[in-house]
Swiss-Prot record:
Protein name: Cytochrome c oxidase subunit 2
Membrane topology: Multi-pass membrane protein
Gene from which this protein is expressed: COII
Names of required cofactors: Cu cation
Keyword terms, alphabetized: Copper, Electron transport, Magnesium, Membrane, Metal-binding, Mitochondrion, Mitochondrion inner membrane, Respiratory chain, Translocase, Transmembrane, Transmembrane helix, Transport
Gene source species: Zootermopsis angusticollis
Functional description taken from the UniProt entry: Component of the cytochrome c oxidase, the last enzyme in the mitochondrial electron transport chain which drives oxidative phosphorylation. The respiratory chain contains 3 multisubunit complexes succinate dehydrogenase (complex II, CII), ubiquinol-cytochrome c oxidoreductase (cytochrome b-c1 complex, complex III, CIII) and cytochrome c oxidase (complex IV, CIV), that cooperate to transfer electrons derived from NADH and succinate to molecular oxygen, creating an electrochemical gradient over the inner membrane that drives transmembrane transport and the ATP synthase.
Length: 228
């Protein structure tokens, strides 16, 4: 999760987020190279001897500054389109969960199991409890097995919401009367935090999301206890 003075993206917990971080670094490198080039040309223009100040046209330079941006865009759009289509693919999910946004809490249904559903509300912050994160704790965590492809179906019961887990690279809009889906695979255990990312009313900032990633064995035990 994000901490104070963190200038980087969150540590990835899924292959998709890892690829998004690589793409971010790739694009940032290209932008840095462009910035350095522009600064170099601006500096050289200010300290030159104005030998070409009466030049009206230059076919070579015009060809270069037309082709160069096109080549740069190819280097940016190619990995971008690859990631875009990769994020839309559903890889034979191991299980499906459904999340419903309400004002101002989340409901979860495990579609592959019988009577496994619950609501998730924000836990009030306690000043004395140093282990709590402000506005990020919930009374019920979404427990999921790691190293398994999960499909999530997102909708809303009242107004627009957005189910977002930054460390998974997931941001799915919750729209009333519409089902949106996405998929992810968690590759490490732990707690993953997120929040509603669509302004949905007075208590919009009080809709945290907590995913608890566990082993398959512990997940089965959790399902059995919840079904009883």
């Amino acid at each position: 999760m994000t901490t104070w003075s963190c200038m980087n993206l969150q540590d990835s917990a899924s292959p998709i987020m890892e690829q998004l971080i690589f793409f971010h670094d790739h694009t940032l490198m290209i932008v840095t190279m462009i910035l350095v080039s522009v600064l170099y040309f601006m500096t050289s223009m200010t300290i030159n001897k104005n030998e070409n100040r009466y030049m009206l046209e230059g076919q070579t330079i015009e060809l270069i500054w037309t082709i160069a941006p096109a080549v740069i865009l190819v280097f940016i759009t190619t990995p971008s389109l690859r990631l875009l289509y990769l994020m839309d693919e559903i890889h034979n999910p191991t299980m499906t969960i459904k999340t419903i946004g309400h004002q101002w809490y989340w409901s979860y249904e495990y579609s592959d199991f019988i009577k496994v559903e619950f609501d998730s509300y924000m836990t009030p912050y306690e000043e004395d409890n140093k282990k709590m994160f402000r506005l990020l704790e919930t009374d019920n965590h979404v427990t999921l097995p790691m190293n398994s492809f999960i499909r999530i179906i997102v909708t809303a019961a009242d107004v627009l919401h957005s189910w977002t887990i930054p460390s998974l690279g997931i941001k799915a809009d919750a729209t009333p009367g519409r089902l949106n889906q996405s998929s992810f695979m968690i590759n490490r255990p732990g707690l993953l935090y997120g929040q509603c990312s669509e302004i949905c009313g007075a208590n919009h900032s009080f809709m945290p999301i907590v995913i608890e990633s566990v082993s398959t064995k512990k997940f089965i035990e959790w399902i059995k206890n919840l079904s009883e």
